[in-house]
Amino acid sequence: MLLMTETNLDVFHAQLLVPQDAPAMDQLCAACGTPGGPDTAALLQTNAVLGDYAGTDTLQAAMAMLPMFGQSRLALALRAAGFGADGQGIVLAPPAFTAQYLPVRRFLAMALGLAKQRCASYHIWAALPLTPTPDGEELCAQYLASGFTLRAVVPLDSQQLLVFAAHTPVGRGSTVRRVHLQDPALPRLLERGGAVADFGWDKQGLVLSVRRME
């Protein structure tokens, strides 16, 4: 699991990318998908993409910071679900990274820190496709370990999105329920005022602790 194998942090050199990094972005996204969608060139112009070459000549990871007032698919989906309806803030797009890239948690934490420099934490969101596979569960765990709180599951085209918030006070009292990522009850529990900041593992995979928000 990534949480257990995150080691080679001495090769962590994340930085904001510039237009000259576009060819490297194209190479990474050819296999992983474009972090910011069709507006990647514009995002590079505005220093809105965090990237890491990890001490190599090849871009190993990238993540875009999209404006909530924009027309990206992520921003539209979140606003339609009632998140950031005023158009303020940032939504962090799903990261693109190579299979060999290890410091995922550190990369996510740095992206969160950069977003907080640009706007208040209660205006920062992150979205990630709900993927009930071992890799998808590991990435969800990385988000939670990086300081994000799972707030909702919303539709986007034919898939579902996990919506994380950068600042959500979660009650530390009794757990409402422990569920797996693929449990159909998860969206309903979150809709009823639950949030997830803690997690664990069992034989079936990732276990999310749903608690009431304070």
What are these regions (language model features)?
Residues Q88-I90, A115-P134:
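Conserved GNAT acetyl-CoA-binding A-motif
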Residues L156-R178, G205-E214:
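C-terminal "cap" of GNAT-fold acetyltransferases
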Residues M1-Y53, L59, S174-R177:
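Short amphipathic alpha-helix that is part of the acyltransferase structural core
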Residues T58-A99:
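Conserved acyl-donor/pantetheine-binding loop and adjacent beta-alpha core of acyl/acetyltransferases
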